[in-house]
């Protein structure tokens, strides 16, 4: 009898220990980030001019990178960048591999169910890049055409809605543009600012841009939903950066223009 009681007690304690362990694992993405002085930032470093590496260099640079560095400085954190495929950023936030994703991520309702977003910091839109001699002169001409996109993006979602379009998915926007250059697709559906930057930098490729109407969207910094303290501190830093002109200076560095004054403080996605 005593032996059975002892066994029951031991079994119960063991079960409690397992539950406690599982409970700790389930919350690691949010709680560990709050305690650590290191801010692990995930980015997909192929999205010029937001995050990229110059040829022959391992150093990250870009609009998002400068913003992330400034936020880390203002929140008293040591920064650690991790290069992550774009469609792996949300899972990396969930499992605690990274604390924050700074990667030109559009705030959408679907993503808001999985992550916590900062206030919007950039207004974007969509565009199709084609060759100057292309038969595609407008959006109506995209029907039945072969279009390159970066997988997991709002551009990919949009391309899949085009009647009869053959959509080719790529890991990186740069790969989608390379496929266009090599003649493997007839157009690349990507973010407008990236299209503008690329076409301006590669005038020898004779490309042109067709802006996609009614596709206004906003980028936000993504974090684990459990880490509300980090979301609050990031928003505080972004607010200060707007007020003291730091964010505008970063805009001018990368886009040669001032930050738009009508970017909303809050945004519920689309």
Regions found by a protein language model. Give the residues of each.
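C-terminal motif of bacterial Sec signal peptides marking the signal peptidase cleavage site
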Residues: 20-24
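Ligand-binding clefts/hinges and TM-proximal coupling segments of bilobed small-molecule sensing domains
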Residues: 27-29, 157-171, 207-211, 239-270
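Extracytoplasmic small-molecule ligand-binding "clamshell" domains
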Residues: 35-104
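Periplasmic-binding protein-like
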Residues: 45, 123-130, 196, 200-235, ...
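Short helix-initiation/N-cap motifs at beta->coil->alpha
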Residues: 65, 81-92, 134, 151-154, ...
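Extended ligand-binding regions for polar small-molecule ligands
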Residues: 65-66, 70-74, 151-153, 220-259
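A ligand-binding cleft/hinge motif common to bilobed small-molecule-binding domains
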Residues: 91, 105-113, 158-160, 181, ...
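Flexible hinge/capping segments at coil-to-helix
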Residues: 130-147
């Amino acid at each position: 009898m005593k032996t059975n009681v002892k066994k029951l007690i031991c079994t119960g304690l063991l079960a409690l220990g397992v539950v406690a362990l599982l409970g700790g694992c389930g919350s690691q993405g949010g709680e560990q980030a709050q305690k650590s002085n290191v801010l692990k930032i995930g980015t997909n470093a192929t999205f010029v001019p937001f995050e990229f590496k110059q040829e022959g260099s391992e150093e990250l640079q870009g609009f998002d990178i400068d913003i992330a560095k400034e936020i880390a400085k203002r929140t008293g954190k040591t920064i650690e960048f991790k290069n992550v495929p774009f469609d792996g950023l949300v899972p990396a936030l969930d499992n605690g591999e990274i604390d924050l994703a700074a990667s030109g991520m559009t705030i959408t309702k679907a993503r808001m169910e999985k992550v916590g977003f900062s206030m919007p910091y950039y207004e974007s839109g969509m565009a199709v890049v084609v060759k100057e001699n292309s038969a595609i002169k407008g959006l109506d001409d995209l029907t039945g055409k072969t279009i390159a996109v970066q997988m997991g993006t709002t551009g990919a979602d949009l391309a899949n809605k085009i009647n009869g379009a053959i959509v080719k998915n790529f890991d990186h926007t740069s790969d989608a543009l390379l496929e266009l250059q090599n003649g493997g697709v007839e157009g690349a559906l990507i973010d407008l600012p990236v299209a503008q930057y690329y076409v301006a930098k590669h005038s020898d490729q004779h490309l042109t841009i067709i802006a996609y109407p009614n596709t206004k969207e906003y980028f936000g910094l993504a974090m684990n939903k459990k880490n509300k303290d980090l979301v609050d501190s990031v928003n505080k830093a972004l607010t200060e950066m707007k007020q003291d002109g730091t964010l505008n200076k970063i805009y001018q560095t990368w886009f040669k223009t001032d930050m738009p004054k009508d970017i909303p403080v809050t945004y519920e996605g689309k």
